[in-house]
């Protein structure tokens, strides 16, 4: 409630926060590492100058999520690769809920979220939270938004449990993603079934 009041009461246009986690990438049989970006980002970001192009008062920095306890629990209790992958995917649902709540608060206050870190699994709760928040604020008639993904991968794989490779599919299937555009999509990185689904939508 205190964070929500701070966001609503701020004159800032943008709200910055971090999601230093890599559980979605690991749940997609990928290599972790997206959890390490937040601190180096801050070291550079805090050295930016406030000027006519970007006034520091336009940005409210509220901190970052800490999902280290989920990572530790999985690392210390999962037995074997299959159980570990399933646990990562289950943990992504928890991350989704927390990120969606925060983004909904930010957008309902008519502000723009700026997010650093995490995998593309975070695209789903960002889209969902933004659509709900902007709809609540009266900015959009339906809780649906359009999205441009600048990536070599479409991240539109089947709904087989949440991970970094299917965020946009979940967002569309759940009705929060209206139009989806991928810029930089690499032919060698898209399964045929995902390609057909994107072309037909």
What annotation goes with each model-predicted range?
Residues 1-201:
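Conserved alpha-helical scaffold segments that buttress catalytic/binding sites
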């Amino acid at each position: 409630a205190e964070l929500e009041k701070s966001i609503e009461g701020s004159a800032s246009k943008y709200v910055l926060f971090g999601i230093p986690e890599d559980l979605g990438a690991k749940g997609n049989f990928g290599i972790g590492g997206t959890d390490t970006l937040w601190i180096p980002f801050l070291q550079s970001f805090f050295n930016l100058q406030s000027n006519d192009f970007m006034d520091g008062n336009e940005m409210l920095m509220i901190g970052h999520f800490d999902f280290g306890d989920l990572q530790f629990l999985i690392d210390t209790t999962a037995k074997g690769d299959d159980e570990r992958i399933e646990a990562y995917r289950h943990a992504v649902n928890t991350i989704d809920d927390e990120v969606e709540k925060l983004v909904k608060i930010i957008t309902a206050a008519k502000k723009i979220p700026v997010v650093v870190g995490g995998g593309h699994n975070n695209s789903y709760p960002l889209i969902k939270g933004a659509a709900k928040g902007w709809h609540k604020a009266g900015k959009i008639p339906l809780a649906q938004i359009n999205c441009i993904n600048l990536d070599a991968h479409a991240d539109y794989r089947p709904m087989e449990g949440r991970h970094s490779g299917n965020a946009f599919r979940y967002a569309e299937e759940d009705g929060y993603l209206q139009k989806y555009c991928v810029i930089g999509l690499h032919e060698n990185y898209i399964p045929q079934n995902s390609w057909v689904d994107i072309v037909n939508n």
